Amino acid sequence: MGGRRPCAGRPPTGTYVIKLSLDFVRGQFPAFSEPSLRDWSNFDNAGESYACRYVIWRLHRTYRERKVGPEGAFPASERAAEELHDARRRVALILGLGIDEVAFGPSTAQNAYVLAQAVRDWLRPGEAIVVTEQDHEAVGAPFRRLAQAGIEIREWPMDRASGHLSQAALERLLEDGKVRLVSFPHVSGVVGEINNVKRICATVRRAGAFSVVDGVAAAPHGLPDIGALGADAYLFSAAKAFGPHQGVMALRQVFARRLPTQAANGASEKDWMRFTPAGLDHAQISACAGLADYIDTLYHHHDKSGRDAAGRAQAISKAMRAREATLMGPLLEYLVGNRHRVRLLGPAQARARTPTFALDTGRPAAPLARRLAEHGIMVGSGECHAPRPLRALGVPPERGVLRLSLLHYTSEADVDRVIQALDAEL
């Protein structure tokens, strides 16, 4: 992305992957010392993650010391403005972006809606966009509504057995040259497969189109180097990635500058403000710097190499994925071994997916979720805002799925516990 900071000075990582200390990781999350949560195992992380202590501390400090407008000529205001700028700068750096390529909004759903409205103003009737059958409705639906403006909507279909999005199917959708934009998920929240974002974005660019990536279900499992992925837009929710209630939207400048401003005054010249019609939540944005604090704390505890911010973030992302792969092993083995009792949607190989498991038992999922709660297991259930992929895979959305999701802070004991609970209730 334009304005990206160089990575000079970052040593090669080779095959070395940091091994995270579970005790140290959990020590960064106040939820693990909260008495009311002590007897629970959290497998509803796809709904929302616990917040790290740095985010909580920054949010509390802002409300206590700096809850003033950031444009004043007095010390509290100057500190508020400084912290707001620092949060934007540090979040951009850990994502491999320039500071003006990161925008914030109340949620990813809101950011997607605003972006879709900008695309609506940009495209002409008869031009086409591609959406997918894997879409989460919060991101996919606003783009589908562009049909009302005469934009042709093409759907990238899933394989009906696996949920996979094939490269060949995408290329067929692009071959007539009418497509201007492709919106797709990095990971579907019910299929769980990790899509090859770098390859897809390169294919889209060769076709003369722009790419919009829904990263909500991917970012909690390791923040991406968005600049390296080649996405023109990348959206994720900080609330699902250890942070506050903010949507983060990366926009490559060559794409952003083609889009009409959506700012309230219609005339903002700042790239990062052009897609924020509701104004800024200063406290929540400032607290996003806590994500960088957390990554740096993990990195410096486990490794002393002299990497830059993006390098530290990628080293920790690899460490998170490695730990999650280890945790997935026993659970995947159990699910595959019990195919006669439960169907796992998406791949059964840890290397191909994130640890978010949508399970179909052939019965309504909500009662099973309530029974698991009696075992001290927190899980999600229902259609998970993903009725399209569920229908495509033969699961009625009204029946729904049981959704188990773990993160790098999940313990081996938690995994054993959920397996025992599933075995008792399936």
What do the predicted segments below correspond to?
Residues G14-L426:
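Pyridoxal 5′-phosphate
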